[in-house]
Amino acid sequence: PLFQQKAAPLGKKLWQTEHYVNSDANISTIMPIAKEIHDVMVTGSANAYVYWWIPHANGLTANDGTLFKRAYVIGQFAKHVRPGYFRVEATATPATNVYVSAYAGNGKVVIVAVNSSTAAVSQTFTLQNATVSQFSTWQTSASANMAAGSEASVSGNSFTFSLPAQSIT
């Protein structure tokens, strides 16, 4: 709130940096990171969420270079929400434990849906002021690391998609 009152009117941008979260390959310990990025972008109206990619056991990679699950969670936002994209209005919490943010840029629409529930959720998305016929999906979950998912076909500006338990799509 202080940012919106004092800095935003002056044209200042808000960037949020990560902080250490004790998490590893366990999806349940990673979900708070996805929720935090969602909150920073939606509630905090941040322009960027910065994760310092430093090779270290507490960072995004193990000492052997293997990516930790948290890297894939951050990638769900970073790979698809590119520089120059802007956040567009979306119902931030369309269901209990489901968090949605949407972005547009370069003629594309990106929706990031976080399902922190321990059960899959069938979620309907309705698009306004956009003409889209289908979405490519990418998922990170207990068993997937930014894996290509099924296509979501849009009919009459809406589509329903199953969000796996504890996943980012």
Question: Can you describe what each PLM-predicted range is?
Answer:
Residues V40, I74, I111, T137, ...:
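Hydrophobic, well-ordered secondary-structure elements that form the walls
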Residues G11-K79, V88-T96:
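Aromatic/acidic polysaccharide-binding cleft in carbohydrate-active enzymes
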Residues P1-L2, N22-N26, H56-T61, A119-V121, ...:
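Flexible loop/turn segments at secondary-structure boundaries
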Residues P1-P9:
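Acidic, glycine-rich loop-and-beta core segments that form the ion-binding/anion-interacting portion
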Residues P1, T17-V21, Y51-P55, A113-S117, ...:
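Active-site-proximal beta-strand/loop segments in catalytic clefts of secreted hydrolases
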Residues S150-T169:
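C-terminal beta-strand-rich structural cap/linker in extracellular carbohydrate-active enzymes
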Residues L127-M146:
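Solvent-exposed beta-hairpin/edge-strand motifs
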Residues T93-S133, Q166:
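Carbohydrate-binding surface patches
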